Amino acid sequence: MKKIDVKILDPRVGKEFPLPTYATSGSAGLDLRACLDDAVELAPGDTTLVPTGLAIHIADPSLAAMMLPRSGLGHKHGIVLGNLVGLIDSDYQGQLMISVWNRGQDSFTIQPGERIAQMIFVPVVQAEFNLVEDFDATDRGEGGFGHSGRQ
């Protein structure tokens, strides 16, 4: 298992609010919690930035972290990430903040310590562009946006 440096920025993390952990041996994501002093009510259509009380430093340029919504919150309550996916670069060292968006039709209250997002680590390949005048022909060519059909 890869070691990632984590800094606790809020003393409640690890005491009142558990550290992020994998729920099962097959879990891909670590749950991130709302490190709030008081509950926050999100009206339909509203967004807010929620602190996690944690900072990470991945350090390895072949890795990045991605923050994703929790499926139950999105499906049952319309609570997703305001930026849809949060990308954490390997050299970022600041607090992990979660942009939360209520795309549902009812107000939703985020409680202190509530699990509101998940974080996964993914490999990164940095590419170098090779400038060309033309591409080698393929069957697909420039077809996109539904080009391959629905069935």
From Swiss-Prot:
Alphabetized UniProt keyword annotations: Hydrolase, Magnesium, Metal-binding, Nucleotide metabolism
N-terminal signal peptide: none
Domain of life: Bacteria
Keyword Membrane: no
EC number(s) given by UniProt: 3.6.1.23
GO molecular function, one term: magnesium ion binding
Enzyme class: hydrolase
A single GO BP: dUTP catabolic process
Metabolic or biological pathway, per its Swiss-Prot or TrEMBL entry: Pyrimidine metabolism; dUMP biosynthesis; dUMP from dCTP (dUTP route): step 2/2
Binding site for substrate: R70, S71, G72, N83, L87, I88, D89, M97
InterPro entries per record: dUTPase (IPR008181), dUTPase-like (IPR029054), dUTPase-like_sf (IPR036157), dUTPase_trimeric (IPR033704)
Pfam families: dUTPase (PF00692)
Transmembrane segments: none
Cofactor: Mg(2+)
Catalytic activity: dUTP + H2O = dUMP + diphosphate + H(+)
UniProt family annotation: Belongs to the dUTPase family.
Function: This enzyme is involved in nucleotide metabolism: it produces dUMP, the immediate precursor of thymidine nucleotides and it decreases the intracellular concentration of dUTP so that uracil cannot be incorporated into DNA.
Subunit text: Homotrimer.
HAMAP family: dUTPase_bact
Protein name: Deoxyuridine 5'-triphosphate nucleotidohydrolase
Naturally occurring in which organism (per UniProt): Escherichia coli O139:H28 (strain E24377A / ETEC)
Name of encoding gene: dut
